[in-house]
Amino acid sequence: MSDIIKLTAAEIAAKIASGELTAVQVTEAHLARIEAVDEKVHAFLHVDREGALAQARAVDEKRERGEKLGPLAGVPLALKDIFTTEGIPTTVGSKILEGWIPPYDATVTKRLKAADVVILGKTNMDEFAMGSSTENSAYGPTGNPWDLTKIPGGSGGGSSAALAAFQAPLAIGTDTGGSIRQPASVTGTVGVKPTYGGVSRYGMVAFSSSLDQGGPCARTVLDAALLHEVIAGHDPMDSTSIDAPVPAVVEAARNGSVDGMRVGVVKQFRGEGYQAGVVQRFDESVELLKSLGAEIVELDCPSFDLALSAYYLIAPSECSSNLARFDGLRYGARVGDDGTHSAEEVTSLTREAGFGPEVKRRIMLGTYALSSGYYDAYYGSAQKVRTLIKQEFERAFEQVDVIVSPTTPTTAFAIGERADDPMAMYLADLCTIPTNLAGNAAMSLPCGLAPEDNLPVGLQIIAPAMKDDRLYKVGAAVEAAFVEKWGHPLIEEAPSL
């Protein structure tokens, strides 16, 4: 394995800025890694080799001219295939958008380019971000670099797998019910769901508009903070974008501390269904926080037990509306366009061929929940539960600065193990969904390996909305303490591919 691909994003940016490395050298090293291992991992759906090298050459030329470089100049990045990229395919893991090349960049894509980040390509994902394992991709599953027979999480398993396989030091994901944090947890990486509205959704293909949020993925807390600062900020193109200063996440990541902080532990985030090794590593993390000077506060949030049920009414309802735009007439795949079918028949045939089973399941569920006579009983009730969850978070944050929990109830499960059991699959997001419903910020970072299977366990940190900096302050302190304890970052234990 090349020494270059072991570097953090912060180290790469510093070495390129000083001239110790060129952006082309760094990009070529990561492209070589992708070529060497991605046949096994399948993290990428599209590798833009020529585009990445062109971006890298532009960074090197900019430096030679003495021009100011972007904050992550020359650092390679893997982009989840849910963000539009001008001239590069965007499939959202679906056959219905196979071959679609967007005519414009998402705001996140634009901001990455403005920061001189080198986009290596687009990563695999569950179709339309609906899944917890990246098995629902129309283009095949992604393997977990720790054990290729295991899932890398979902929906953004391609992004987390690319990080764990050292194919890129940075990645972008999206989080609707845990799709950044859950993959980070099972691959031993860092993933952050910013405050809802903190990162623009313009050009991000919609699943559930009131829940979707883009965010940074990395192998270290500082790298995630550097990326967070690049992509965050108000965007007039997104009506849900928050018009407020971006929290000082990089400063927080450089000054990690929990001394004197009140840290909440929620009673509902443990019990039946939680793997013993996950609970053990979480309990050790709580003891670590105590040793670092934090005060632990027990919290009771009974409405959190209803979060999963509420989510699986709200998200499918919004998805059934959002996916109505894929009609086979305006863009993407088109089936039955031979002059013998009506427009309505073309739409029906296109959706039947283009959407996978999980997407169809959620569209039907959402349509039913919104239907006349059932709206109040299902969607309306779910929104009331959502309000209760928000209120319980608000009361909790009157007592504590942050809340911690396991990120997922179990470590990575085997590919195919839960394919025929949707409920078992949905339970993977048990700890992450409440945060999405409330719009708060959350992070997952590695807290060790489960003794039973030697697979990564994630610690989730939750902060109030627009207090994203607290995630990084706590996360950096915990990360430093664990690295000192282990003698090296957890990710260095990942088996060689």
Curated annotation (Swiss-Prot):
EC number in record: 6.3.5.7
Keywords associated with the record: ATP-binding, Ligase, Nucleotide-binding, Protein biosynthesis
Catalytic residues (UniProt): K80, S155, S179
Gene3D superfamilies: Amidase signature (AS) domain
Any Gene Ontology CC annotation: glutamyl-tRNA(Gln) amidotransferase complex
GO molecular function: ATP binding; glutaminyl-tRNA synthase (glutamine-hydrolyzing) activity
InterPro entries linked: Amidase, Amidase_CS, Amidase_dom, AS_sf, GatA
Cytoplasm among keywords: no
Domain of life: Bacteria
Gene Ontology biological-process entries: translation
Catalysed reactions, semicolon-separated: L-glutamyl-tRNA(Gln) + L-glutamine + ATP + H2O = L-glutaminyl-tRNA(Gln) + L-glutamate + ADP + phosphate + H(+)
Similarity comment: Belongs to the amidase family. GatA subfamily.
Subunit structure: Heterotrimer of A, B and C subunits.
Protein's job: Allows the formation of correctly charged Gln-tRNA(Gln) through the transamidation of misacylated Glu-tRNA(Gln) in organisms which lack glutaminyl-tRNA synthetase. The reaction takes place in the presence of glutamine and ATP through an activated gamma-phospho-Glu-tRNA(Gln).
Name the UniProt record assigns to this protein: Glutamyl-tRNA(Gln) amidotransferase subunit A
Source organism of this protein record: Streptomyces coelicolor (strain ATCC BAA-471 / A3(2) / M145)
